[in-house]
Amino acid sequence: MSSKEQKTPEGQAPEEIITEQHDDVEAVEPEVSAEQVDPRDEKIANLEAQLAEAQKREREVMLRAKADEDNLRRRTEQDIEKAHKFALEKFVNELLPVIDSLDRALEVADKANPELAPMVEGIELTLKSMLDVVRKFGVEVIADTNVPLDPNVHQAIAMVESEDVAAGNVLAVMQKGYTLNGRTIRAAMVTVAKAK
């Protein structure tokens, strides 16, 4: 037996012992200095940063486009709703003089004359049916007295002293006003009470 074989533990070949000793030693990688950085790594990092920035810009553009689309859809819906609501405005404006004429005819008619009673009744029924029809389409009459003056629906043409009506309230309606779905299409011409 040689001296090498004597030093090895029983049953182990000398190669196995050397392998075990190498396993105990940690692999040490050589340190890379800043000067030895691979230029490809730097280029990859630069390209990744550019890609992230481009993705961020694209995301912002998509969000802005979606917001613009939502705003356009909302505006279009509002415009369509207004068009439906106020499509009758011109037609109602054309009917107002007819309604006013029927009102004036009733004011001046001699209701005490029995010969005119059928005509007066016909005018009243015609006016009532016309007002019923326009009410179905959102038209409301502004003709209340003893209510506070509202510049949105009233046009004051005179101020008169009154003890019966509070100052600043509508005393009399000279010409009725009308609204269409809440929008004033003709303000009521009124006289307003003032304090003595």
UniProtKB/Swiss-Prot annotation:
Any one GO BP annotation for this protein: protein folding
UniProt-listed SUPFAM superfamilies: Coiled-coil domain of nucleotide exchange factor GrpE, Head domain of nucleotide exchange factor GrpE
Region (Disordered): 1-41
Compartment(s) where it occurs, according to its Swiss-Prot or TrEMBL record: Cytoplasm
GO cellular component terms attached to this protein's record: cytosol
Disulfides per UniProt: none
Family: Belongs to the GrpE family.
Assembly with partners or alone: Homodimer.
Record-given protein name: Protein GrpE
